[in-house]
Amino acid sequence: MTDAHQADDVRYQPLNELDPEVAAAIAGELARQRDTLEMIASENFVPRSVLQAQGSVLTNKYAEGYPGRRYYGGCEQVDIIEDLARDRAKALFGAEFANVQPHSGAQANAAVLMTLAEPGDKIMGLSLAHGGHLTHGMKLNFSGKLYEVVAYGVDPETMRVDMDQVREIALKEQPKVIIAGWSAYPRHLDFEAFQSIAAEVGAKLWVDMAHFAGLVAAGLHPSPVPYSDVVSSTVHKTLGGPRSGIILAKQEYAKKLNSSVFPGQQGGPLMHAVAAKATSLKIAGTEQFRDRQARTLEGARILAERLTASDAKAAGVDVLTGGTDVHLVLADLRNSQMDGQQAEDLLHEVGITVNRNAVPFDPRPPMVTSGLRIGTPALATRGFDIPAFTEVADIIGTALANGKSADIESLRGRVAKLAADYPLYEGLEDWTIV
């Protein structure tokens, strides 16, 4: 085909010519990510290699089934890729079994529950209002509709999970599955204690490590794998990979978990995403990745310390549990004149993206909330070091301490300098996706 014919053929037209509206929105999102500071705890930036894998010709390939047992021909190359992803996941986390096909963390969690319980069985997880996840039993979620749900919570004084309460509820309710994991909780969980309680009541233990999997991979967070029957995770939070899920388990659950993913929850896997997972899991075994996770933790600790300073306290700002063990800080605004929505909007004005989040025993409605969930993974990926994290922590602390009286222009200028000092995706426009 001649160049002239290619220019008129939609198969060869670049995105900015064929669909300028979509191209402009993507360019706008790239500018937003570059020019602002991303501090939503569940977000991160994937490396060039992951963008290339996910934007590859693998998007064309259907591959229902598993390596060596596909329902379609032509799967030789995708079999290699899926085997790489499974082997890397098992090696990284010390697991006996891995399934890398789930399209998302929620899909992975649905498959886990399909494996460990029957509809109508009782499951027990951390209350959504106290930091749990939708898929751990929220009444409007599939997990709340298909299963009988009981919840444990945090102690009203310490704001930490009380293992005595967990045991008391488990003994009374006799759940089929106990879930350890969270979406907004700043401390380690005691996986050994959860295992002991599960064994005592004859329950299966499932740990959802979506938020802290990267820390586990780096050896900077206790691993749930030795204590759990099944572990699930997303790949895009602290692991810093594509938006997708994985499942790890003891070998005895392999056959049922595979069946629960396909055909139980999904048809064909997204092989471009599986390739991106494989690449992300390779990166997660490097020393550079471990350094990034260490800076993630240090950044969160610096932020927690700044938000407990005298000016923040005077403005009614507090930090849930008084600090953090992980990649996020939960700012408690119950005694502040600002609610979570107002605080989120204020930080958005200065160029920092966070999300409002309910705190335990929150008196405000869930769309308003009395808290902020602030995370450091994306900034660590961007290259932030201790001085940079100290600066962004001070920007946030100053903004929350001053509220509507904050000097927005001054704070925005400080954010802009940090964004310029730690550039993101340099040369992206020139990268070739193959």
Swiss-Prot record:
Belongs to the SHMT family. It is found in: Cytoplasm. Keywords: Amino-acid biosynthesis, Cytoplasm, One-carbon metabolism, Pyridoxal phosphate, Transferase. One of its GO terms (cellular component) is cytosol. The modification N6-(pyridoxal phosphate)lysine is found at residue 237. InterPro entries: PyrdxlP-dep_Trfase, PyrdxlP-dep_Trfase_major, PyrdxlP-dep_Trfase_small, Ser_HO-MeTrfase, Ser_HO-MeTrfase-like, Ser_HO-MeTrfase_PLP_BS, SHMT-like_dom. Its cofactor is pyridoxal 5'-phosphate. It comes from Corynebacterium glutamicum (strain ATCC 13032 / DSM 20300 / JCM 1318 / BCRC 11384 / CCUG 27702 / LMG 3730 / NBRC 12168 / NCIMB 10025 / NRRL B-2784 / 534). Pathway: One-carbon metabolism; tetrahydrofolate interconversion; Amino-acid biosynthesis; glycine biosynthesis; glycine from L-serine: step 1/1. This is Serine hydroxymethyltransferase. Transmembrane segments: none annotated. It comes from the Bacteria. Its EC number is 2.1.2.1. (6S)-5,6,7,8-tetrahydrofolate binds at residues 128, 132-134. Catalyzes the reversible interconversion of serine and glycine with tetrahydrofolate (THF) serving as the one-carbon carrier. This reaction serves as the major source of one-carbon groups required for the biosynthesis of purines, thymidylate, methionine, and other important biomolecules. Also exhibits THF-independent aldolase activity toward beta-hydroxyamino acids, producing glycine and aldehydes, via a retro-aldol mechanism. The record marks 236 as: Plays an important role in substrate specificity. It holds the Pfam family SHMT. GO terms for molecular function: glycine hydroxymethyltransferase activity; pyridoxal phosphate binding. One of its GO terms (biological process) is glycine biosynthetic process from serine. It catalyses: (6R)-5,10-methylene-5,6,7,8-tetrahydrofolate + glycine + H2O = (6S)-5,6,7,8-tetrahydrofolate + L-serine. It is an enzyme of class 2 (transferase).
